[in-house]
Regions:
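Alpha-helix capping and helix-loop boundary segments enriched in small/acidic/polar residues
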Residues: 4, 82, 146-149, 173
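Hydrophobic/aromatic-rich core segments of domains that either
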Residues: 153-221
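Active-site nucleophilic cysteine motif
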Residues: 109-112, 146-162
């Protein structure tokens, strides 16, 4: 987040969270610009439940006066703190169910990718509604509570879980070439290299690895996404300087046409299957990810 939004916004976010947990309604913030972007972008990525608990200041255009920002409570402060703690336990429960302490960052990303493909569903009803009207109820938090969602909810939830597990992760957005439709997926940095992961496209596949640890080229290939439209985290990154987020390491190319079966932390191998031959025979394949 700091690479895209800068230190001032990250500091304001930390101050906001401290104020919420203390039951206050003011916090230190540099200026209105910092406030607007931080309040608009950070909760969904960094503490999804917060949108249910607080809102902007009553006087939205003058939310920051002399370096002090304010916000409004949607629920009593005590209830907010209790709900944040309950949400934290929910997230901890998912991570404890899916991950082991000894997992590497790659193994965490893989285990959660498979978990998403097997446990969550795409919300087609909401997707269809969005073609006809503005929908304002989608959020990462809704996805965790219902188990269904659309792309921005799903990818935000996947990236949020990875961040809580210590993996560098965020969201990436872009447009398809054939209909210009927007889409959001996850973007990770593992072993100092960047990769695209699309947990939305993985839903219901029961472990197809074609959307896991993709390069820019592979991301573009899967449903004709246009690399020049890619942007990280939010529209803010389109307007402000940030590091290059090129994903060009194709170490995981051998997995993209395989179906997952299992992986071994001890041997650093992924066991999977591939369909080949005239009669569609299934052949076992083992991928060595030593070093990851």
């Amino acid at each position: 987040m700091e690479e895209v939004f800068g230190k001032d916004m990250c500091d304001a976010w930390s101050n906001l969270v401290d104020a919420v947990m203390a039951g206050e309604n003011t916090f230190a913030c540099k200026d209105q610009h910092t406030y607007d972007w931080m309040m608009g972008q950070f909760p969904e990525h960094c503490l999804p439940i917060l949108r249910e608990l607080i809102d902007y200041a009553y006087d939205r255009e003058h939310s920051v006066i002399d370096g002090v920002a304010s916000f409004t409570w949607l629920v009593p402060p005590g209830e907010a703190k209790a709900r944040i703690e309950a949400f934290g336990k929910q997230i901890e429960g998912i991570l404890n169910e899916v991950l082991e302490d000894e997992y590497s960052d790659l193994e965490k990303a893989l285990a959660l990718y498979i978990y998403f493909s097997e446990h969550y569903e795409y919300d087609y009803d909401t997707y269809m509604q969005m073609n006809d009207k503005y929908v304002d109820y989608t959020s990462c938090y809704r996805f965790f509570q219902t188990g269904i969602g659309i792309c921005h909810e799903i990818s935000s939830a996947y990236s949020y879980l990875l961040m809580q597990a210590g993996v560098q992760a965020t969201s990436m957005s872009g447009n398809r070439g054939y209909d210009k439709a927007g889409h959001q997926w996850s973007f990770v940095r593992i072993n100092g290299k960047n990769y695209h992961i699309d947990p939305t496209y993985a839903l219901g596949t029961r472990g197809e690895l074609r959307y896991f640890m993709m390069t820019d080229e592979k991301r573009a290939e899967e449903d004709e996404y246009i690399p020049s439209t890619f942007y990280a985290v939010s529209h803010y990154s389109r307007e402000n300087p940030h590091p290059d987020y090129t994903a060009d390491d194709d170490t995981f190319r051998p997995l993209w046409d395989k179906d997952f079966e299992s992986f071994s932390h001890e041997t650093h191998t992924i066991r999977c299957w591939t369909e080949s031959g005239y009669y569609g025979e299934w052949t076992e394949f083992e991928f060595d990810y030593a070093g990851y």
